[in-house]
């Protein structure tokens, strides 16, 4: 098989690493694999197509900020990509994030409909079936069900400073993204699959393939983290996000800090320099790290991982914590609860701070050691990247066979 993946980035960020992990599995099985990507430098992949350049990205950003016309820039770069696709002639075209200031979705989907090749589209958020935003559930917006308009998230990614074009964007996306003859949608969670089936994409078959992680990297890992941060006698509550925002639950950590016991400490990884300066007593802020090995050390050291997300498609950070033997407490939001069972953590109703405090007390009373083996087993049974991304290979084969 010859597979072409298309994503905004390659080898960086969660979706970029998913693409390169899948690329590696395809190569290990003797298949041909190429990744086309739109921004930054490619990592962990030697067979790539760069879509445009930063000089294509910048006008697309401007178009988005001024006209709220995200996904309708980068025309020249997209035409060149289509020429490369024709020359490559892949058996399956696998789409990931098409947002990110690098593609003209109109040109791409006109080509996909004309080419009539099998297409797999992994949705990593909700941008595909809205008129603007990538996430809407955390504010309770329901406009996407019928037609977006008067977008309450116009100032969120992909940010528009002036115009609200959400109604027109919705109409154009619906026209472009429907009617593709051989398209299969994949979502990382049952939650997102449910939304897809209620959207204008409902005509397509939807498969759920959970994200996977590298269990050789994310595993219980000893370190001197406690000593370096003077936390030897502290119960460590860990949070990881990049960037920290309202949706990621940043405010809940600030509120939680006011209710800590004297021997409890919050560690937040991924805080900005500005956020770090404003953190209250009780919270240690650490900048974003691109080192998975360093993250594994921090996950392993923590007594409890807290994910008070208001909306998450699945929650890669949950999986990483579990794989390192650390129990997880998360809100009942999005696909985040799908990561857990009762043996490796607790689920609290979204926004319930007293419930969060009670869950922390419950885990602390039982002790991390009572959870660790089951946390690791949960990750091994359900979120091993080789097994999960191997499901994509089987999906490709089934699609081509049919």
Give residue ranges: language-model regions:
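Acidic anion/phosphate-binding donor-loop and adjacent secondary structure
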Residues: 194-197, 213-228, 277-278
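Nucleotide-activated donor-binding/catalytic signature segment of Leloir-type glycosyltransferases, i.e.
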Residues: 273-296
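Short acidic/histidine- and often glycine-rich active-site loop of Leloir-type glycosyltransferases
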Residues: 277, 332-342, 346-347
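Aromatic "clamp/platform" in nucleotide-sugar-dependent glycosyltransferases that forms part
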Residues: 310
